[in-house]
Amino acid sequence: MWRERAARCGEAIAEQFCILRGYEILARNAREGRGELDLVALDRDTVVFVEVKFRAGPNRAGQARGGNDRGGPLAAVTGKKRDDVARAATRWLAARGATGRPVRFDVIGITWCSEESELRVQHVPNAFPGGSRHFF
């Protein structure tokens, strides 16, 4: 339950981050087949699929609870996750007749450092090219 709440909180922070940068939010937590897209946004004429990763830890190194360092939020976007997001994005675009639109995949990593009472947001635009097998 804590994990779900933290994920939703991270997604809300990422959404506000995107809005402040001029993105128009098109969808939140969009389910496409078995996949889910955290955020779908429009940055000028480009459809942006944003994968959000949230981590909470005691220190600046991004260590998780219990001192377990999992590499921070961006390290959680594995090759399989990239493929899953790309597959869901393909379905999302096809369902809306938008397969010819420019597309980008961003990752927003959010880390809460409790010892420092600091929230860090890291945005990686064009973080991956659409997965290893699924591109438009």
Residue ranges of each PLM-predicted region?
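Acidic-basic catalytic patches of nuclease active cores, encompassing PD-(D/E)XK
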Residues: 1-28
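Conserved catalytic cores of phosphodiester-cleaving nucleases, focusing on short active-site segments
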Residues: 18, 37-62, 77, 85
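Hydrophobic residues on conserved beta-strands that form the core of alpha/beta folds
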Residues: 25-27, 49, 105
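Short acidic/glycine-enriched loop/turn segments that link adjacent beta-strands
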Residues: 32-35
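A solvent-exposed, charged loop/short amphipathic helix patch at secondary-structure junctions
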Residues: 63-67
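Mid-chain, well-packed structural core segment of small domains
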Residues: 69-103
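Domain-level recognition of nuclease-like catalytic cores that cleave nucleotide substrates
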Residues: 94-136
